[in-house]
């Protein structure tokens, strides 16, 4: 966590990661996006990457991963709003899981 004297309106972080499907036991590659409204502190990029890398080799469904990552971000920076989106493809089907917490953020156009 990094303390900031001036908070931006919204922070959006994106990266890729891997986990293991608990059903098929195959490697699941995913793209993850985290959006949050900071409240005096922001998540260090290295800390975010470490959070995502913690799923490598771990058996977890994407639905659980999205909620787990949301809880980690909330614990780290206590944002009033956070949204985690996990995207992947499995047997030709695009899977997108969203976990949100807090009030509705302002609309960005």
UniProtKB/Swiss-Prot annotation:
Signal peptide: none
Catalytic residues of the enzyme: 21, 28
MF (Gene Ontology): preQ1 synthase activity; transferase activity
Biological process terms in GO annotation: queuosine biosynthetic process; tRNA processing
One Pfam family cited in the UniProt record for this chain: QueF
Subunit structure comment from the entry: Forms a symmetric tunnel-fold (T-fold) homodecamer of two head-to-head facing pentameric subunits, with 10 active sites at the intermonomer interfaces.
Catalyzed chemical reaction(s): 7-cyano-7-carbaguanosine(15) in tRNA + NH4(+) = archaeosine(15) in tRNA
Family, per entry: Belongs to the archaeosine synthase type 2 family.
Pathway(s) per entry: tRNA modification; archaeosine-tRNA biosynthesis
InterPro entries reported for this sequence: GTP-CH-I_C/QueF, NADPH_dep_7-cyano-7-deazaG_red, QueF
Function as written in the Swiss-Prot or TrEMBL entry: Is responsible for the final step in the biosynthesis of archaeosine, a modified nucleoside present in the dihydrouridine loop (D-loop) of archaeal tRNA. Catalyzes the conversion of 7-cyano-7-deazaguanine (preQ0)-modified tRNA to archaeosine-tRNA, transforming a nitrile group to a formamidine group. Can use neither glutamine nor asparagine as amino donor in vitro, is only able to utilize free ammonium. However, the enzyme might function in vivo with a partner that serves to generate ammonium.
Organism, as annotated: Pyrobaculum calidifontis (strain DSM 21063 / JCM 11548 / VA1)
Protein name: Archaeosine synthase
Keywords: Transferase, tRNA processing
Superkingdom assignment: Archaea
E.C. number: 2.6.1.-
UniProt: substrate binding residues: 28, 43-46, 62-63
């Amino acid at each position: 966590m990094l303390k900031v004297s001036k908070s931006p309106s919204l922070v959006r972080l994106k990266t890729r990661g891997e986990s293991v499907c608990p059903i098929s036991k195959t490697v699941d590659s995913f793209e993850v996006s985290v959006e949050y409204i900071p409240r005096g502190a922001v998540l260090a990029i290295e800390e975010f990457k470490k959070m995502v890398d913690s799923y490598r080799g771990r058996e977890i469904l994407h639905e659980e991963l999205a909620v787990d990552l949301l809880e980690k971000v909330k614990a780290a920076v206590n944002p009033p709003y956070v949204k985690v989106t996990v995207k992947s493809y499995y047997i030709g089907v695009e899977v997108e899981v969203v976990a949100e917490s807090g009030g509705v953020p302002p609309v960005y156009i």
